[in-house]
Amino acid sequence: MAGLHFIAQEPICKGWSQDKKYRVTDAQGVHYLLRISPAEQYDRKKNEFERMRTIAALGIPMCKPIEFGICDAGVYSVQSWIDGTDAEEAIPTLTREAQYACGWEAGHILRKIHSVPVPENLEEWAVRFNRKIDLKMEKYKACPFQFEDGQVFIDYINENRSLLNDRPQVYQHGDYHRGNMRIGRDGKLYILDFDRDDYGDPWEDMKAITWD
């Protein structure tokens, strides 16, 4: 790694990302987040790193992208480390007022994330999402396990496909929920893990709320 030298590393085992993640420490005792991905993902990870720079420039509270490159283990990125507690653990311990404030701030931050410019040549949202619906329905019909009265749900979806027409598309975080947030020691909310980012309907970025 060109500009940084680490004297200690601690693996991070939380999360579903396929990246190997470490909290690393330099000689001055400063902590960083180190992510390592397979070498064949170079182009995708390079683009992801550049998009993170764009997002950080908006003032989004997040792990700031610092360095990107290739190492013996694959493709690496170094980001600033957020001292604090995972939001999944911290938020249930807060007062209702403080929880509400975190939710409001999360929405405010997401609105900023959605302000990142999108490519002009994006496929229409209705085309993209209808294709996804069709695939899910095909898999459901091929599954030997069926819900009682499951056809009611299928009919409802088919009857409302027109709502997908003419929808705006924005830059999406892609995995926006408490598991990818952190409450810093300064009490502020920070956003983590942009490795599932995408473009699409702004409401789709709220899908992970069902996991919270």
Predicted regions and their residues:
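ATP-binding pocket architecture of kinase catalytic cores
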Residues: 11-124
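Generic detector of well-ordered alpha-helical packing
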Residues: 49, 81, 174-176, 194-196, ...
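Conserved N-terminal boundary motif of the eukaryotic protein kinase catalytic domain
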Residues: 3-11
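Conserved catalytic motifs of the protein kinase core domain
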Residues: 29, 74, 167-169, 187
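Hydrophobic residue at the +6 position relative to the catalytic HRD Asp in the kinase catalytic loop
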Residues: 179-181
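An alpha-helical support segment within catalytic cores of ATP-dependent transferases
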Residues: 1-2, 104, 112-174
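Active-site Asp-x-Gly
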Residues: 169-171, 184-212
